[in-house]
């Protein structure tokens, strides 16, 4: 095997081995929002920017139509910034199985009606067998309760559970 073939094969292997990350809409929102006066939110915004610049190039990052739906809401100028930030991210498909799984999560995780799309984000990441689901939603997605219950539910369904984490928890891949 020539050196060029080895190098090509190594690069192909590296590409194939990149971790996959589903970015829930809070990631895009924190990335593009004007700096907050709230110290915790401002820190999350800064961590998100660092993650976007340093880690995102090392992973295969995805969003879904649900993310596009959420980032398109609200103030038109802010929504446009979010849409622009997400425009080059691959969008995972949605199908009936994902919708059914989202409904199951919605009920079993006791997610409030106003946060129904949080169950959809979980279902997309699970169905597509994504490695990490990245979010700043620490109530209905990245919470100890949800992590535990989701693993239990998915074990009974024979489904792989992604690692649910914040950008701060995924600074290295």
What do the predicted segments below correspond to?
Residues 1-63, 70-81, 89, 107-113, ...:
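Short, well-structured N-terminal submotif of metal-dependent ribonuclease cores
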Residues 25, 65, 136-138:
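Short secondary-structure boundary segments
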Residues 65, 95, 167-168:
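Residues at the C-termini of beta-strands that transition into short coil/loop
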Residues 159-173:
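Short, C-terminally biased terminal segments at protein or domain edges
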């Amino acid at each position: 095997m020539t050196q060029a073939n080895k190098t090509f094969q190594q690069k192909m292997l590296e590409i194939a081995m990149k971790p996959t990350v589903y970015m829930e809409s809070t990631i895009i929102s924190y990335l593009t929002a004007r700096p907050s006066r709230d110290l915790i939110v401002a820190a999350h915004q800064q961590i998100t920017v660092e993650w976007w610049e340093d880690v995102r190039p090392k992973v295969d990052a995805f969003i879904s139509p649900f993310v596009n739906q959420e980032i398109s809401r609200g103030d038109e100028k802010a929504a446009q910034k979010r849409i622009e930030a997400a425009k080059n991210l691959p969008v995972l498909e949605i199908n009936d199985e994902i919708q059914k799984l989202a409904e199951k999560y919605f009920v079993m995780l006791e997610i409030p009606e106003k946060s129904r799309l949080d169950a959809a984000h979980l279902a997309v990441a699970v169905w597509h067998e994504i490695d990490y689901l990245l979010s700043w939603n620490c109530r209905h997605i990245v919470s100890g309760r949800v992590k535990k219950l989701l693993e239990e539910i998915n074990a009974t369904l024979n489904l792989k559970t992604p690692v649910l984490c914040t950008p701060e928890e995924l600074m290295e891949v």
